[in-house]
Amino acid sequence: MSKRVQIVLNKTINKLGQTGDLVEVAPGYARNYLIPQGMGVIATPGILRQVEQRKEKEMQRLLAEKQAAEARKVALSTIGRFTIRKQVGEGEAIFGTVTTQEVADAIQAATNQEVDRRGITLPEISQTGFYKATVKLHPEVTAEIEIQVAPL
C-alpha cells in the first residue's frame, strides 16, 4: 500500500489547502474522512483536467474583472472632478463633513457606475475647496479623483 495518496479538495480545509488544491495525504485520512465527508476526491487524470479547466476559467474571470476596473479608472480620470455641494458657514467652513457615501453618490450620478463607499479614502474635509481622494476599484487598481466642495 502506498504511503500517500493524491486528493483534490472540494472544500477549503485549515492547514491542508484551498478548494481545488492537489494535496498528498495519508490513505486512511483520505479513505475515512475526506472522501466520505465530501471534502475531497481521489486525483484521477479526468479530475485533474477538470481542476485545470476550473482554474483557467477563474483566471480569465479575474483578468476580466481587472480589465473592467481599469476601464472604470479611465472613465473616472476623464471626468476629472466631482462636485459636492454643502451648506457653508462663516469662513468657508462647511457644516458637517463630506462622507464617502456622498462621494460614491457623486460618482454614480456622473458616471452611472456604482462604487463601493468602503473603497473610497478621503482626507479630512472641513472647508470648501479642492481635495484629492483615492478610489479602490479592484485589489490591484486604484484611481485618484478630485473632489470640489462648493457652497449650496
From Swiss-Prot:
Xref: Pfam families: Ribosomal_L9_C, Ribosomal_L9_N
Any one of the GO BP annotations: translation
Keywords, alphabetical: Ribonucleoprotein, Ribosomal protein, RNA-binding, rRNA-binding
Any GO CC annotation of this UniProt entry: ribosome
Domain of life: Bacteria
GO function terms (MF aspect): rRNA binding; structural constituent of ribosome
PANTHER family per UniProt: 50S RIBOSOMAL PROTEIN L9
Its biological purpose: Binds to the 23S rRNA.
Family statement: Belongs to the bacterial ribosomal protein bL9 family.
HAMAP family recorded: Ribosomal_bL9 (MF_00503)
Family annotation (NCBIfam families): L9 (TIGR00158)
Protein name, per record: Large ribosomal subunit protein bL9
Gene it is expressed from: rplI
